[in-house]
Amino acid sequence: MSNLQTIIEDAFERRAEITPSTASAEIKDAVFSVLADLDSGKLRVAERTDGQNWVTHQWIKKAVLLSFRLEDNVLLDDGVTKYFDKVPPKFANYTEADFKAGGFRVVPNAIVRRGSFIAKNAVLMPSYVNIGAYVGEGTMVDTWATVGSCAQIGKNVHLSGGVGIGGVLEPVQAGPTIIGDNCFIGARSEVVEGVIVEDNCVISMGVYIGQSTKIYDRETGEIHYGRVPTGSVVVSGNLPSKDGSYSLYCAVIVKKVDEKTLGKVGINELLRGI
């Protein structure tokens, strides 16, 4: 355990007594150091260990939570309107040189909070990226899409218009929502509650997946919870009750594709003839 982690863990146990005026310089320096490293991509709330397995660094989430106890709300002015919050925008002090060095594109009305990371060649349409989130290289966050606190978005992902990727700060032991590399998330879909969508998946428009959502594989009859397997093409559907008197919403895996097929075949073509 690093010295930084030790300071954060100890402070979190005493978080109820911590305020901007009572917190020690050591605690403030540790928390703000973590936020700076999240902002630069040096630290991530969750990291891939191997294959489709991830490890969550809960102490980093604790640092994010502690940051809310260390700062008072202040007046924020973007030149158009004013806000009153504890977390400043990521780009508040960016220069043209900073944006060029970052290598990403930010369209007007995109909002990104400090403590989140945007990788090179990412494109942010008018969207919202919350504190602790990670947006991977070459990813498109489309109009009105939301990337929640600590959510992890992989490389070459397309989050379509109005998509919601849920944030998970509390409970602390919960893992963040994760979207793997090369995924397409269709318009107005929601992936929340720490669900993991593995690499090369296609989620159709209007699919809602939380930890309690049944993810039904129609080829095998298997039901998954909390994780969409690699290469799944998923649409919304229903499963009947045992007595057939009603049905309940589920997500249905209608087919599987590999990365090569995904790269060659258009998304609409994959979703036709299902």
Curated annotation (Swiss-Prot):
Domain of life assignment: Bacteria
* Positions of substrate binding: R105, D142
Query: Could you name the Gene Ontology cellular component terms for this entry?
Result: cytoplasm
* Keyword line: Acyltransferase, Amino-acid biosynthesis, Cytoplasm, Diaminopimelate biosynthesis, Lysine biosynthesis, Repeat, Transferase
This enzyme catalyses: (S)-2,3,4,5-tetrahydrodipicolinate + succinyl-CoA + H2O = (S)-2-succinylamino-6-oxoheptanedioate + CoA
GO MF annotations in UniProt:
2,3,4,5-tetrahydropyridine-2,6-dicarboxylate N-succinyltransferase activity; nucleotidyltransferase activity
UniProt cross-references to Pfam families, sorted A to Z: Hexapep_2, THDPS_N_2
Q: Give the EC number(s) listed in the UniProt record.
A: 2.3.1.117
A GO biological process held by the record: diaminopimelate biosynthetic process
Q: How does it assemble?
A: Homotrimer.
Family classification:
Belongs to the transferase hexapeptide repeat family.
Q: Name the NCBIfam families for this protein.
A: dapD, PRK11830.1
- Full protein name: 2,3,4,5-tetrahydropyridine-2,6-dicarboxylate N-succinyltransferase
